[in-house]
Amino acid sequence: MAQRRQDGSAGDADYGAPGSTYSRYRRPDPRIAAVITQALGEARTVLNVGAGAGSYEPTDREVTAVEPSAVMRAQRPAHLAPAVDATAEQLPFADDSFDAAITTFSVHQWQDLPAGLAELRRVTRGPVVILTCDPARVQEFWVREYAPEVLEVEARRCPSPEALADGLGGSVSISTVLIPQGCTDGFTEAYYGRPEHLLDVEAQRACSAWSLVDPAVIDRFTRELAGDLLDGTWDAQHGALRTLPRYEGSLVLLVAEP
């Protein structure tokens, strides 16, 4: 059985910590949502595992959400159904209950990845769609120049796409998801062209890897990035990112058909 924190969180990060601000910073981006919707095909019943505050749940289908954190469940908007309190490793549903399943920015939190993937496959008749980060590419981001520890944590936590494919079996496609400029879903790479936003403590807290490093790392990051923005160093090296329409980072979409 997965070990859970006071608010029910079942991963290495305490999702009770960001409090009520998480959903302000992690709002689904419609351009990324369109990619997920396309991957779901004609599925009418969809399971969302690690659903959080409801990001990327399609509103034109029958969705069942699973989320272990009480804080995250409380932030679900009124137009979405309440989430079931459960973990990926022990889904309380019969075999083949859903046409499709999704999990977004969640697999790095699972305590037993093979068990969670087996459960997803067990309860899903059709495609399992996973939005995650490829650990092989996480450390290519400019944040490494200021807080490499954050990206090292992220790379260690994220399972490889190949491991996910092996765990799900069947026919699997893996594709890069381009991150749009002005992305409303505030994961770290979403700020590729808006570095000032990553000086916001609440923006950092909405990305769980930042909570898993020593506070001194955050202090150094904030001090050095702020200085480089003030004197133009960041823009001299990375300024082209401010107008880049889409950034090819570590974000990937995996679609596994049985």
State what each model feature region is.
Residues 45-91:
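Class I SAM-dependent methyltransferase SAM/SAH-binding core
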Residues 99-114, 134:
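A short SAM/SAH-binding and catalytic strip from SAM-dependent methyltransferases
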Residues 114-128:
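A short glycine-rich, Lys/Arg-flanked "PGG" loop and its adjoining helix->strand segment in the class I
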Residues 1-44, 55, 70-75, 127-161, 182-189:
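Conserved class I S-adenosyl-L-methionine
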Residues 174-258:
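Conserved Class I S-adenosyl-L-methionine
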Residues 43, 98-99, 125:
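Local beta-strand N-terminus motif with an aromatic residue
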Residues 89-100:
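A short acidic, Gly/Pro-enriched loop at the edge of an enzyme's catalytic core
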